[in-house]
Swiss-Prot record:
Residues 262-275 have a biased composition (Basic and acidic residues). It holds the Pfam family EF-Ts_N. Residues 276-291 have a biased composition (Acidic residues). Residues 254-295 are annotated as: Disordered. HAMAP family: EF_Ts. It comes from Branchiostoma floridae (Florida lancelet). This is Elongation factor Ts, mitochondrial. GO terms for biological process: mitochondrial translational elongation. GO terms for cellular component: mitochondrion. GO terms for molecular function: translation elongation factor activity. Belongs to the EF-Ts family. It is found in: Mitochondrion. The keyword Mitochondrion applies.
Length: 331
């Protein structure tokens, strides 16, 4: 029996209304805008972002929270599954504020992931969290501080309402590679005008800065250097630049100890040309295997040793630390 005309019209009207609601530019625009925002903010796939928005009726805040919770759960599961995979790549991060600094190493499996913004963000968060940990313990900064912390210790560090361990799991869930927080060096000298901490990062990642108070820099190599200003009469004293140059030497020449100051050289005018040449050859031979920093030829000026450079600048080298991403530590 055919349907009454009115019913047919009603069905057609409902279908038209459904089509109107489905294609309405305002509603469709809101969905697309939120989908784009959520995708850009979280980095998750469009499929997962749409699923989250549908689940919470386009509520961005709730959708983002749910996505992160799911990624973190998946990340912890992946972390357990991938924990035996080798992590030889990664980045070194250096954060500094005044006479306090921290240097961290976070590893991943491939250089491709090491260049990913999400991984860089994690390394920055680890570096800033460790610096915050130093600042949270004022008693540590009253004297000399040099403490190496393991990845297992660092995972427990709180950052906001989460931990570094949870952040790492979240990043593993997003990027799909084994990621390990390997180590962190806490470093500080007494906050007095004559003592300084210098920082240097080699092969820095574009868009990161280092060497300024409150900054964080990322790269493949890093160095922290502690030194004391002995002669306050020197003009144009630039502690940050001196620290950067000393750190560059540490990264490039890989000294093992500070060592002892070399003896003051004789005046060049008192030597014959032949004697000068012989001494230069002997100096070159010995410098190749020299591990005491003060006795090494200064990387940025081969005409002098590091010791002579510090004497010239009126400073005393106290200590240094060098990190190389992926290096094998001697047992």
């Amino acid at each position: 029996m055919p349907c009454p005309t009115g019913v047919t019209r009603c069905s057609a009207g409902v279908s038209s209304l459904a089509r109107c609601l489905h294609t309405c530019p305002v509603l469709e625009g809101v969905t697309k805008a939120n989908l784009s925002k959520l995708r850009k903010k979280t980095g998750f796939t469009f499929v997962n972002c749409r699923k989250a928005l549908e689940k919470f009726e386009n509520d961005l805040e709730q959708a983002e929270k749910w996505l992160k919770e799911q990624a973190q759960k998946e990340g912890w599961a992946k972390a357990t599954k991938l924990q035996d995979r080798q992590t030889a790549q990664g980045l070194v991060g250096v954060a500094q504020e005044g006479t306090m600094a921290t240097m961290v190493e976070v590893n991943c499996e491939t250089d491709f992931v090491a260049r990913n913004p999400k991984f860089r963000q994690l390394v920055t968060q680890v570096a800033m969290a460790t610096l915050g940990d130093v600042k949270a313990h004022p008693q540590w900064t009253l004297g000399w501080l040099k403490a190496l912390h393991t990845g297992e210790e660092l995972k427990q560090l709180q950052i906001g309402d989460t931990t570094l361990g949870d952040l790492t799991a979240l990043t593993i869930g997003t990027l799909g590679e084994n990621i390990q927080i390997r180590r962190a060096m806490y470093y500080s000298v007494p906050p007095i005008p004559t003592k300084h901490v210098g920082v240097y990062v080699h092969a820095p990642v574009a868009g990161t800065t280092g060497g300024q108070s409150g900054s964080c820099a990322l790269g493949k190599y890093g160095a922290l250097v502690a030194f004391r200003r002995k002669n306050t009469e020197f003009q144009n004293f630039n502690a940050a630049e001196l620290g950067r140059r000393l750190g560059q030497h540490v990264v490039g020449m890989s000294p093992l100890t500070v060592g002892e100051m070399p003896e003051v050289r004789e005046e060049e005018g008192e030597k014959k040309d032949g004697d000068k040449q012989d001494e230069e050859e002997r100096s070159t031979d010995s410098d190749e295997d020299e591990t005491q920093m003060l006795r090494q030829t200064f990387l940025l000026d081969p005409t002098m040793t590091v010791g002579e450079m510090t004497r010239q600048q009126g400073i005393e080298l106290l200590d240094f630390v060098r990190f190389e991403c992926g290096e094998v530590e001697e047992s």
